[in-house]
Amino acid sequence: EDLSDVVYYADLSEWQEIFAVLCTYAKQEDFSVLAERLGQRLEDRYLHSVQLGTPALTDRKNVVLCYLAAGCLEKVMSMWIEEMQEEEYAIKSGNTQRDNSPYSAHAEALQTLMEKVVVFQHAVQYTDEDLQPPVPNDDGTVPVREFKLAPLYNYILEYVNVLAEQGLLVIALKFVALTPPAYT
């Protein structure tokens, strides 16, 4: 309970110390929940700074770190999608030394996002519950599913199209497997 109080009430300017305390003293079964809560507090602060028009990108990176440590793909996904959109804009704007056509910019930003997702899934042995078959109701009907990673699935399917257009069908099929069969 003491660690929970630290996460909930400690000054966020000391977030690194809070994180170090969690890494050192949190029980394994409590760590993810506490790291996620710390990430949520940091994300709230980050979103508040965005609303004020003064977003601190270091805050976003800190949020991502906490969510990664917690193994929360659902939470880190929104941050990565935001980064992907910024990367795509930077490429299109010509702020890089790369091909800045809209298609190339989007494909490159998508690839960066997919690399992050795949590395994350392997690093934390993430299991996507939405890839499991749905449990039928008592009457035998299958419930309508809401996919918590729907925004990510949309980008995965876009990436599948990019890969298929390049003739990389074997790789495209591996990415299709990262989306639920019932997802459309």
Region annotations inferred by a language model:
Residues 1-184:
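Extended alpha-helical solenoid/arm regions of large eukaryotic scaffolding proteins
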